[in-house]
Amino acid sequence: WANGAKYTGHWKNDKKNGKGIMNWDDGCKYEGDWKDDVRHGKGVFEYTNGDKYDGDWADDIQHGRGTYYFHTGDRYEGSYLLGERTGEGVYYHANGDKYVGNFKNGMQDGKGTFTWANGAVYEGSWKNNKRDGRGVYKWSNGDVYDGDWKDNRPNGQGTLKTVAGMQYKGGFVDGLEDGQGVQIDKDGNRFEGFFKQGKKNGPFVETDKDGKVIKKGTYKFGRLQ
């Protein structure tokens, strides 16, 4: 071949058809099915950087089901559409993290569960590799957030429960309590008021577990006025 590539395999009508092996001079290699000079069917492609794809091909691109082995130690098993990870799949990270769910154009997109090696888990909606939409995040220490997400952070309405017994239900902005919310401590005491960037801010009412008012007043950025 003019480009230094070498093909060993079956031919039909002067075209690569059937089983065959192609070695390129840059070190790439494909072994598998061919149809009319293009990769079509099942095949394994080895990249010069050490990556490897083993799976379905259609019209010379990855299409169907396949496994992609990254030289970094990462691995993807799942659906491909026109050369991109699209559909359902599992992505294993070399560090022990794992994502199971939907992909779109190579990114986590749709519904999916991400489990971190440290034990944290997120189950919910994704968009462009980021937590986006409704989802539940459980920290490795047992704290849980259930609510709205945007750009990988709690944004919107949600509920945060800690293992220490505290519960907050209300607004969030960029991961912090923001807007109107209700905070309940482990003894059942209830704080109803407003928050700004994680601090109490604005008028509030505190009641005990029986509903008796303990305190009323106003906070200004975390300080009682």
Describe the role of every protein-language-model region.
Residues 1-225:
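Glycine/tyrosine- and acidic-biased, solvent-exposed loop/turn segments at the edges of beta-strands
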